[in-house]
């Protein structure tokens, strides 16, 4: 299965770690540091991705929830996994959908979640 993941993470160290982890899992990984870059990639390549892995707090006007809504508008089949180092109201996930992991990340759990989501997308 050729599964593509879009990673949106503003912390360069975390982004690099996620890239390496997911590439080592055999996934096609595209990563961007911010919302504007994510919107640009999605506008051109949204159908390519089976999974969006996005930080919630990106230090900009848009957050991971905004990116997820845009991604789903362009690719209804995309699965979303949110990550954050900050507390998030669980009711927000009930309305937004998607899976959620807190930082620091359990890399084995993350890899399993991405593969499960990628498998459902195909």
What is each model feature region?
Residues 34, 62-66:
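Acidic catalytic/metal-coordinating carboxylates
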Residues 55-56:
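Active-site residues of response regulator receiver
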Residues 65-76:
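Short amphipathic alpha-helix used as the core "switch/output" element in two-component signaling
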Residues 31-51:
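Acidic, metal-coordinating helix/loop segments flanking the phosphotransfer/catalytic sites
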Residues 12-31:
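Two-component/phosphorelay signaling modules centered on CheY-like receiver
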